[in-house]
């Protein structure tokens, strides 16, 4: 349904919630949003719901309020779980718990989380020792716990009144389906289920995975049925692939007083560009989070970014959903998201709670069709902007600066290569490959935007004919050292072991060749027959070759002994090899 909720419906909903819940609500919130009234009314009428509502519209309270009332009515035992909320990331779980806590404290209920980043044994111990009334979990971690203690979990969840799937469009990906089936097997079938997302769960079969029955559809839409808030303005900038990094930096520099969130396609990309940007944006607070950060580090970085006035956060999609930082001015997407629906979630980190916000995506020339694709499939219109301060000359100057940064530390050099590889792997899997295929991507330009010194060999690029256009650097990468002395010492050891292994392999091959030739000589009676110059001449040539090869083998063995005794320097080893 698409409507504005009237005063009568809102009043009726308030009456259903009861005084305890309203007391907490009225202290912190001014009024109900449409999605809260519509979804909450259906849930309290004991109907399943599928809710599609824009980011920043109050979806969390849309299930928290009716959930608290349902648990209140159920009169749970102290050790019974009355509600299970599944969310795709630990940050979202943490944020949901923060919304629930004031209501839970008022009603003397205990809310707990189980997410990745914690030990499974610790989670199991919590189930055994604590009375849990509301559980907020990532499906992957809850699945792991069920694998260890299914009977215990099923017993704890026998009183579940409500199952909530937050960011439901993420859960119809293949990796979640097995987890969901196992989780659903542990909770009662006679329960209510709510699916909540900013974008549509597109297939009917997806609803079957979650066990919904005769679900009510709630759709609170903005203009043109867009999933984005009306206060959000979406832009794109067209630029050559090799100027993307320059355009990104110049755009940020023009907005010195703005808080900016930048999305990159992989953990390695975030780590690499954090190293680059901290040397290029020296006057701005810079933060970075990705899926492989530790929980304390991620929490500290998000908190510091939230408290900054003009900070720049570099992130993967861990920041794309549910992270409620209300004053982000600009969201920048360095490249296309893996799924077009994720564009909406990324952009939705700005323009929250009625504030104005802006989102920008960097589009390479060969990716221009994506603008129409977004309009047709996600109902998102993009307006073009220019970044006049970014030029090809500045892009080349930046590339040279990035090369110097890599030369200063081998760790950054290797990180840049891994970041580029993961970027290509991610691009090969996005959902609009028919209009923006990897075959059409300017790979050489993208490599230059990463300032690569060497183009790595990749299976995804094996058939490309244009890679010879890449201008390989004259810098000898093997001479670049780690800034960390421990890493450099370890590299020396590894290189020495490789040299030794190579010489040992050569010696073994030579020994095998000599043995084979000896057997051949024996079978021929000690003489080779020659078609051209006669047996005697051929025999002399064979003996000469054998003598030379034996000398080479002996030299290799002597060299190996010198290396093992440490009598050769690194340069002498390299020159000999």
Swiss-Prot record:
SUPFAM superfamilies: P-loop containing nucleoside triphosphate hydrolases (SSF52540)
Domain Helicase ATP-binding: start-end pairs: 40-218
Enzyme nomenclature, EC number: 3.6.4.13
Motif window: Q motif: 7-37
The reaction(s) this protein catalyses: ATP + H2O = ADP + phosphate + H(+)
SMART domains membership: DEXDc, DUF4217, HELICc
Binding site for ATP: 53-60
Stated family: Belongs to the DEAD box helicase family. DDX55/SPB4 subfamily.
UniProt function note: Probable ATP-binding RNA helicase.
Protein name: Probable ATP-dependent RNA helicase DDX55 homolog
Organism from which the protein derives: Caenorhabditis briggsae
